[in-house]
C-alpha cells in the first residue's frame, strides 16, 4: 500500500522493494540466530501496471509470462547448477536434473542477499505464473503453457492449478509447492483479475492453514 501511494517509477519501485527485502532478510537472520537454527526462503514478486511488469527475485522460485504466443521464463534460477551451466560445465538438460539444482546461491534469511530486479513490457493479452521449485521440477514448459492458455474461465484456471499441484504431489515431489496465476484479456481488466489471483493464492499456498502462516510470521516480524 505504501508503494502504491508513491510515484510509480521503476527506480522508486526497486528502491522500495530492496528496503523491504533487506529488512525481512535481517529479521529472518535474527530469528534463526536467536532460535539456534538455519533457515532460508526464496521470493519472486511481480507488480503489474497498465503497461509494465516489474519483477524481483531471490532464489529459485520462477516467474513465467505467457504473451499470447509463447511462454517465457522471466527469472533465472539462482542455483549452483545454473551457475555451472552458464560456465559451460553442464548442459541445460544436465542442469535440470543435477543435484546442485537444489543448492541456492542466495536466499532470504541466510548469508548475503542481493535481489535481482527487472522490468518488461506487459502484453495486451497474456498471463503470469509464479511457481516454487516444487512446481517447476515436475512440469515441463509445454505443460505450464497449456495450463495457462487452455482454461477459458477463472474457475477452469484455478482448477488447472489445483490439478498441477496434485500431479506434482503424486509424482513424488516433496518440496514446497506454491502456484499463483493471473491472466488478463486486456489492459483494462487488471483490477478484477488481481482479486482472482489472491483467491488462487489462498487456496494453493502450501499445506498449513493460513492462520498458521500468520502465527509464524508474527513471531518473526
What are these regions (language model features)?
Residues 1-221:
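PP2C/PPM-type serine/threonine phosphatase catalytic domain
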